[in-house]
UniProtKB/Swiss-Prot annotation:
GO terms for molecular function: haptoglobin binding; heme binding; metal ion binding; organic acid binding; oxygen binding; oxygen carrier activity; peroxidase activity. Keywords: Heme, Iron, Metal-binding, Oxygen transport, Transport. SUPFAM superfamilies: Globin-like (SSF46458). The keyword Membrane does not apply. This is Hemoglobin subunit beta-1/2.
Length: 146
């Protein structure tokens, strides 16, 4: 992936202001509510029976924060995102057997929650850079499936 200086700056700025404790839980919760088939990977998380249960689930919140912090790896390795996620790709494909299409669904939910949080500051240019970044991460996470 080729990055312009402007894209690097946008990604860096997003992560320097990221509210992990707010955006992470909301993004994962949204994914589990909007795409209920993704819940099958979280059977040990307790109450996932309805939106209220998911949104108030401490395990979902904690994992959402963990997932969002996982994006730090890509931000710190923008010139080599694919290699930065080799171990996580292997884990999700070989041990957890996660459908790689779910990474895209979650990335869309992260984008929606971030856009809502940033408001007018989430310009088309910001969205373009952020979605390019997430697409690179999603591709890297799916690498071991091929």
């Amino acid at each position: 992936v080729e990055w312009t200086d402007k894209e690097r700056s946008i990604i860096s700025d997003i992560f320097s202001h990221m509210d992990y404790d707010d955006i992470g839980p909301k993004a994962l919760s949204r994914c589990l509510v909007v795409y209920p088939w993704t819940q099958r990977y979280f059977s040990g998380f307790g109450n996932l029976y309805n939106a209220e249960g998911i949104m108030s689930n401490a395990n979902v919140a904690a994992h959402g924060i963990k997932v969002l912090h996982g994006l730090d790896r890509g931000m710190k390795n923008m010139d080599n995102i694919a290699d930065a996620y080799t171990d996580l790709s292997t884990l999700h494909s070989e041990k957890l057997h996660v459908d790689p299409d779910n990474f895209k669904l979650l990335s869309d939910c992260i984008t929606i929650v971030l856009a809502a949080k940033m408001g007018h500051a989430f310009t088309a240019e910001t969205q373009g850079a952020f979605q390019k970044f997430l697409a690179a991460v999603v591709s890297a996470l799916g690498k071991q499936y091929h």
